[in-house]
Amino acid sequence: MNLMLITFNEFKTGISLNDTRAEHLVKILKLKDNDKFKFGILGEKNIYHCIYKKDKKLFFKKIFKVGESNKLKKLYVLIGMIRPIVAKRIIKELASIGTYKIIFFNTELTEKSYLNSKIFKNNDCEKHLIAGAMQGKITYLPKIKIIKNLKESLKYIQQENFEIKILLEKNSEKNLIDIEQINNAVIIVGPERGFTEKEKQLIAQYNFSPYSISTNTLRTETATIAASIITASKLINM
């Protein structure tokens, strides 16, 4: 945890010492009285130092400003529905990168029961977003959207006018690392069993271009994170 993230209400009232964030300060970082740690408030740009004091709760005070959070990058990532345990890891990593929006959708080869997982139905994903944002020292969280199928997902992002639309495709002759600097981008990644040819044709109709990041067959998790890091590195900071 490189940055403790709290809500505005937690800033006013403090958090329990049993909270995993408070426990991390003591058990992992080994903080003692009068040691400093960094915190930020969700949705606010400033990052502050705070003095740790053992008390009935962990209270926060803005001792002095030490910096500002990076903004989210104008990067959308569309992912064919995957196993919930894999989705959790992807959500955390994309939050640490500073992705703007993550969209999950069903495909022809998706296991449809995944959509009923609590991570997608009960807003369980927020804790994974926060964990990723704390790792990336970002005070902003990506938005997550669940869409019922591929076509609706493509329609949803059509109005955004992306400068580049990337379909991850192992056999493409174009390598993602070679793209120019851009202001915004969208990536679409197939589920663990990939897209059907019919789905690839539909994606092409929405002006996505195939790019490769490796000639090897990668797991969806690996491909999504690697492609997002590469693309994010090409985005011009706004």
Curated annotation (Swiss-Prot):
Principal localisation: cytoplasm
EC category name: transferase
Record GO cellular component, one term: cytoplasm
Enzyme Commission identifier(s): 2.1.1.193
Catalyzed chemical reaction(s): uridine(1498) in 16S rRNA + S-adenosyl-L-methionine = N(3)-methyluridine(1498) in 16S rRNA + S-adenosyl-L-homocysteine + H(+)
Segment forming the signal sequence: none
Pfam family, one: Methyltrans_RNA
Record keywords, A-Z: Cytoplasm, Methyltransferase, rRNA processing, S-adenosyl-L-methionine, Transferase
Places the protein is found: Cytoplasm
GO annotation, biological process: rRNA base methylation
Entry GO MF terms: rRNA (uridine-N3-)-methyltransferase activity
PANTHER family: 16S RRNA (URACIL(1498)-N(3))-METHYLTRANSFERASE (PTHR30027:SF3), RIBOSOMAL RNA SMALL SUBUNIT METHYLTRANSFERASE E (PTHR30027)
Function of the protein: Specifically methylates the N3 position of the uracil ring of uridine 1498 (m3U1498) in 16S rRNA. Acts on the fully assembled 30S ribosomal subunit.
Family (UniProt): Belongs to the RNA methyltransferase RsmE family.
Name under which the protein is recorded: Ribosomal RNA small subunit methyltransferase E 1
